[in-house]
């Protein structure tokens, strides 16, 4: 059994309250006082108190902006080239912070055999993976995999690849790092999908160290043992969550039907995930549900007949950080490990995240 031996997270410097973000968005999404009031009500009911960004502009005055133009209408609006330049500058420090905390007192950087980098908010070649190798002086012969444009479920997919590697290559030490700078892709498009996306998404990074079971035992690493993965695509939701390139950045489509699609599919996903394991809902101690939004957590809680305490970590991450896309489920797993897990007990954790497709990706973990 492969083991997630360590999880660490990192946040950018600028913390914005949800009301401050709502004020900023209202300036560009609402052309009347009535629309501004409606938008602020949406923000107040989002379940989010604060979000982090690599950009200070969302709670600063017009003259203090550093990313957007100091104009009343943000023109000339940032191009995709400018946004990618900003990503390349700001993403690496977050990755390094998360990685250094993750591997500290676990392994030396020179011992890492595989690097899996994850992002859907920045792309370039040579890319983030090579920047990490260079900065940390990793072995130039390290095996590298980049997982791009999968969205919020990509961390679980990356853990799946790490698990495959550990099972196939004795001695493998796999580092997974996810970083998303969602806030550099703010768009002024005045439609509900875009308004909801701007209300939810934030910036952050997370790293996970995955090793084969024998290495974990030899080094007395405690962590999450990986039991199983299961993925399911709800093709009737293919157009309800999309992420596409444009001349002014990445465009998010996030329809209001997503909670309904998840509500209809989550029971079957859970049932199929448990096949061959003889596990029931009552056997799961901890629930690492990706907090894609308050409504998503509510429908999952209802459909799986969970108590509010079962999703405590998911709600806490949503409240304090918002939806950071791929790193978010790792934030939830870290919160569970730090605050809820009793490491000496054989507790089970069920994790699930959602993304374009509509894809639902799940993972079953056991304390080791």
Model-derived segments and their meaning:
Residues 42, 46-138, 281-297:
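Conserved beta-ketoacyl condensing-enzyme motif
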Residues 48, 90-104, 161, 205, ...:
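Short, well-ordered amphipathic alpha-helical segments that serve as non-catalytic structural scaffolds
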Residues 78, 110-114, 136-148, 188-193, ...:
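Glycine/charged-rich beta-loop-alpha catalytic/anionic-binding loops adjacent to active sites
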Residues 98-112, 218, 267-285, 304, ...:
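Phosphate/pyrophosphate-binding loops at sites that engage ATP/ADP/AMP, CoA/4′-phosphopantetheine
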Residues 120-121, 139-141, 146-167, 263, ...:
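Claisen-condensing/thiolase-fold acyl-transfer catalytic domains that form or cleave C-C bonds
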Residues 123-138, 176-187, 238-243, 297-311:
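Acidic-glycine-rich active-site phosphate/pyrophosphate-binding loop
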Residues 140-142, 147, 157-161, 178-198, ...:
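Active-site glycine-rich loop that binds ribose-phosphate moieties when present
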């Amino acid at each position: 059994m492969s083991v997630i031996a360590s999880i660490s997270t990192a946040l950018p410097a600028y913390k914005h309250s949800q009301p401050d973000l709502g004020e900023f968005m209202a300036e560009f999404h609402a052309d009347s006082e009535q629309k501004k009031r409606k938008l602020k009500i949406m923000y107040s009911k989002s379940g989010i108190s604060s979000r982090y960004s690599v950009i200070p502009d969302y709670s600063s005055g017009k003259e203090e902006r550093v990313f957007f133009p100091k104009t009343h209408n943000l023109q000339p609006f940032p191009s995709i080239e400018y946004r990618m330049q900003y990503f390349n500058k700001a993403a690496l420090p977050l990755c390094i912070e998360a990685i250094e905390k993750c591997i500290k007192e676990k392994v030396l950087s020179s011992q890492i055999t595989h690097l899996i980098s994850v992002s859907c908010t920045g792309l370039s070649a040579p890319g983030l993976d090579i920047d990490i190798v260079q900065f940390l002086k990793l072995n130039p012969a390290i095996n590298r995999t980049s997982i791009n444009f999968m969205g919020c479920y990509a961390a679980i997919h990356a853990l799946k690849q790490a698990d495959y590697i550990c099972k196939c290559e004795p001695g493998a030490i796999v580092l997974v790092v996810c970083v998303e700078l969602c806030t550099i892709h703010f768009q002024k498009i005045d439609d509900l999908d875009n308004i909801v996306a701007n209300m939810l998404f934030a910036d952050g990074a997370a790293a996970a160290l995955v090793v084969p079971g024998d290495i974990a035992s030899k080094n007395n690493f405690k962590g999450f043992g990986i039991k199983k993965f299961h993925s399911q695509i709800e093709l009737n939701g293919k157009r309800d969550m999309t992420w596409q390139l444009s001349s002014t950045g990445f465009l998010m489509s996030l329809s209001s039907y997503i909670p309904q699609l998840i509500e209809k599919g989550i029971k079957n996903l859970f049932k199929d995930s448990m096949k061959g394991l003889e596990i029931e809902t009552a056997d799961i101690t901890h629930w690492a549900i990706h907090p894609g939004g308050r409504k998503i957590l509510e429908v999952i809680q209802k459909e799986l007949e969970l108590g509010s305490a079962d999703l405590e970590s998911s709600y806490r991450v949503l409240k304090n950080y918002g939806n950071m896309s791929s790193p978010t489920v790792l934030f939830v797993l870290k919160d569970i490990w730090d605050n809820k897990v009793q490491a000496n007990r054989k507790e089970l954790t069920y994790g699930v995240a959602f993304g374009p497709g509509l894809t639902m990706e799940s993972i079953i973990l056991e304390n080791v």
